[in-house]
Structure formats: C-alpha cells, structure tokens
Amino acid sequence: MAVPTVTMQSLLDVGAHFGHQTHRWNPKMKPYIFGDRNGIHIMDLSQTVPLFTRALDFISQTVAHGGKVLFVGTKRQAQEPIADAARRSGQFFVNHRWLGGMLTNWRTISGSIKRLKSLEEKLSGDTAGFTKKEILQLTRERDKLELSLGGIRDMGTIPDIMFVVDANKEELAIKEANTLGIPVVAILDSNVSPDGIAFPIPANDDAARAVRYYCDAIAEAATRGDQQNRQELGEDLGAAVEPAAEEALA
C-alpha cells in the first residue's frame, strides 16, 4: 500500500530540521542530530525521511486491519492541526489536557464519556423542567467534559497506535501507552528523550507549519489504511453487496 511521500525538500520547506538551542539538548538525541548552526541543533533529515516513512507505513497497515489511531498534542500550536487531522481521517484525539488514567483507567473515562453523552441528550431535549441555574450548571459540565473527552467520545476502547507531537509535554500519555503496550509514533525534537518511542521521527516539534505537515501526513496514512479496510470488507461480503464494494473503492 502506498503511503504519503515524505521528502527531504518538503521537510526543509516547513523548517523540520531546526532543533532547539544546543544547551537545551537531550544527549539521547545525539544519533539523530546532524550538527549545529548559530547555537541551534540541526536534525539529521536523512534519518527523518525513512523513519517517518516507516511510521506512516505502520499506521496505514494497522488501520487497514481495523486499528485505531489516537492523535495527542496539547501544546497551543498543535491543538488545531491535531483535531483537524484526526477528524478528517476518522480517528481520535486529545488536544486540551491529558487526564491521568485516560488510557490506564479506561473504565472510569468511559463513565465520564457516558455522562457527556447523557448531558448532551438532556440539553438538546426539553429543558422545561430545569431552572436557568440548573441549565447553566449542566452546560458548564458538558462543555468541560467535551473539551477533555470530545475527541475520544466514540473511540470505544483503547487505541492501537498513539501519535504524539512533543514527547516532553505528553510524557504522561506516553507512559500510559507504554504501560498498555500501545506503540507510540512521536515527533522528537532535540530536547526530548527517545525512550519509550517505538517509531521516532526526529524533527522540529514547535514550528506551526511543520506540526501541521506531520499531522496531515499521519492523517493521510490513516485514511489510506481505512480505505483499504473498507475495500477488503466489501470484497469479503461478495457479490451480494457489490454496490458497497464499489462505493468503498470510489
């Protein structure tokens, strides 16, 4: 299955090669650093290209077999691209704040998601039985839950892959994924540790254009995997559902 094409030029165009100031580096990233320029580490994009391609292939293959991807990026410049990419590819996201136990205590989180859906149902129906104060309280509770859990409300269970922008900021999410054996694909800047990352992608994790580029590529890989999954399901169903198979191929 073809995956999105990542090139050295496309990475250079979005500034993926710029790391952090040399004094802020994590020595564990030394193998992925090309050198430094004016006190700034330069990432070795000759490694980034094949590593990124490998990660995209893994995501496509996993989704093609029915797997789910959880996009995680709570820093300001990642919030919108993370949500957009996940929604566009039919996947899931956390872009506000990682709640402790979001994966390792999934049963409790599932209860909170049920509460969110219950509140939405109440507020979208007849609210004549509630006072204005009660409606305001319910609305605030719903909005708070939506902010934290809206991106995973339909995930149903823990994901098969986690994609992370900024491994330092999302350290807790990565720890939970590691505990549960969920492979982590992560953008690794020069100031982070690659420990616990199954699919490292050494690159700038701060530049807005770069972050959107990574998210778009991951989304495209997931979308291609989903298309293959739908196509294969259609073929398995046989001639009786030929129109569905044709629709999946469209």
Curated annotation (Swiss-Prot):
PROSITE patterns: RIBOSOMAL_S2_2
Annotated Pfam families: Ribosomal_S2
InterPro entries (UniProt xref): Ribosomal_uS2, Ribosomal_uS2_bac/mit/plastid, Ribosomal_uS2_CS, Ribosomal_uS2_flav_dom_sf
Record carries keyword Protein transport: no
KW Mitochondrion (keyword) present: no
GO terms of biological process kind: translation
Annotated PANTHER family: 30S RIBOSOMAL PROTEIN S2 PROKARYOTIC AND ORGANELLAR, SMALL RIBOSOMAL SUBUNIT PROTEIN US2M
Record family assignment: Belongs to the universal ribosomal protein uS2 family.
Name of the protein described by the UniProt record: Small ribosomal subunit protein uS2
Name of the coding gene: rpsB
